């Protein structure tokens, strides 16, 4: 679990399409450097949120200035990590500790989809970004003043246009210095993880409704039965 408060900006040093080494897992791997600041207490097998994606550390260099991660096909489908190349900058955050304040919000590192920056404009000392979701079904989980993780950064939604599958955020000057988004422009992609709370509520309601519908003695089934009977009676009376 992560907080969405980026600790460090690293640099992609190497991307291997088919890494046959023990630490590569016979798939896509990535080496990220310029990050000794966050590697002091990280062990092999630990998780590091990389541009919003929870990735497992599989290798260090001797100086602990860089680390390797493997990237699964599912991650490549869901995120934009496949677009990264040597020189790309990435947001990094270590997994949260029990004694860390939750200054952002609960971020799993499980990216749902990507979005494209469709507008960027200055607003005093802030930068306002507008994004368009690739997969519109995730728009229902995005609400004004709610949380959202963009490239692993915990941000507050300022506006939502559900019909266009678009939403906006405003980034204050302090955050601009700590994350990679100010380096991006219109047309660039970002990783999106919607707030888990909305998903949990939706699933609980869905399962509860299904349970009530299947139970003929439940209050909901009784109510539906009465409504259907009333509708049928009304139709018969008109005929």
Curated annotation (Swiss-Prot):
One of its GO terms (biological process) is riboflavin biosynthetic process. Its EC number is 2.5.1.9. It holds the Pfam family Lum_binding. Pathway: Cofactor biosynthesis; riboflavin biosynthesis; riboflavin from 2-hydroxy-3-oxobutyl phosphate and 5-amino-6-(D-ribitylamino)uracil: step 2/2. 2,4-dihydroxypteridine 2 binds at residues 54-56, 70-75, 109-111, 145. Keywords: Repeat, Riboflavin biosynthesis, Transferase. 2,4-dihydroxypteridine 1 binds at residues 4-6, 154-156, 170-175. It catalyses: 2 6,7-dimethyl-8-(1-D-ribityl)lumazine + H(+) = 5-amino-6-(D-ribitylamino)uracil + riboflavin. The keyword Kinase does not apply. Disulfide bonds: none annotated. Induction: Repressed by iron. CDD domains: Riboflavin_synthase_like. One of its GO terms (molecular function) is riboflavin synthase activity. Lumazine-binding repeats lie at residues 1-105, 106-205. Transmembrane segments: none annotated. The keyword tRNA-binding does not apply. PANTHER family: RIBOFLAVIN SYNTHASE (PTHR21098:SF0), RIBOFLAVIN SYNTHASE ALPHA CHAIN (PTHR21098). Homotrimer. Catalyzes the dismutation of two molecules of 6,7-dimethyl-8-ribityllumazine, resulting in the formation of riboflavin and 5-amino-6-(D-ribitylamino)uracil. NCBIfam families: PRK09289.1, ribE. This is Riboflavin synthase. It comes from Meyerozyma guilliermondii (strain ATCC 6260 / CBS 566 / DSM 6381 / JCM 1539 / NBRC 10279 / NRRL Y-324). The gene is RIB5.
